Amino acid sequence: MITGYDGGGGAAAVVVGASGALGSAIASRLAGAGLVVVGVARKPVDAAGVIGCAADIGDDAAVDVIRAAVDDVGLPVRMVVQAAGLPAAGPLPTIDPTALGSAVSLKVGGMLRLVRAVADRLGPGSRLVALGGHYGTEPSPHTCAAGVTNAALANLVRQLADHHGPDGVTAHLVAPGPADTDRLRRLSQARADERGVDVEEILAERRAESPLSVLVTPEQVAWAVATLLDPEADALTGSTLALDVGARRGI
């Protein structure tokens, strides 16, 4: 069911998408903070100190798989993080509507599945964290699925905050801008191929969206998520923490 657990520790975290760039950075950071981390992914998890749990968060069967893994650890859950990445579903003019629905099921439905899997182990001070993204509030026809899904995720986080607040459990959306990951480079390469330009030109355009002319790093995202463990983060429940290096233009 799970791999790599030796029976130690005092509280657990569950990170979905732990084989990806953002999820693995978050899982490693939380493990470094002293939590016993269960890393959920379809692929093998290769993050130091992280327990692997094979499950597809887009499938309802993941609820029982994750619940069993957490029960094997036998600790209260201090934090869950839904960091599953979306497949490249295409721009607005050509996206398959079915693919859009699948994206919502993966990220938004996946957050519900994750919370239900650990519900019996939540308590005062537990954090429910979802990774959204810049395009949830800055719509772009090039990123249809990401925009629609991350906007819906922000709404779900507010609902989770309202529902779980009386139990002392908080909910948070962390919304990075375009992050410097292999996935971003693959998407940028696809756009470069469409336009007949070099991929570095596309990456430069993405960096130029920020007044700092940089991309967010996985380490910065992991830092922000770990900061939510602080008791002062109660004040942030239901809100969105934007990590877009100034790219968002809305007020």
Residue ranges and their predicted role:
Residues S19, A27:
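N-terminal Rossmann NAD(P)H-binding glycine-rich loop of SDR-like oxidoreductase domains
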Residues D71-D72, L106-S126, A161-D162, D230:
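Amphipathic alpha-helical dimer-interface segment in Rossmann-like NAD(P)H-dependent oxidoreductases
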Residues A83-A89, G246:
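Conserved NAD(P)H cofactor-binding loop of Rossmann-fold oxidoreductase domains
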Residues L86, P93-R113, V129, A146, ...:
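Catalytic Tyr-X3-Lys loop
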Residues R127-L153, V157-P166, P178:
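Catalytic loop of short-chain dehydrogenase/reductase
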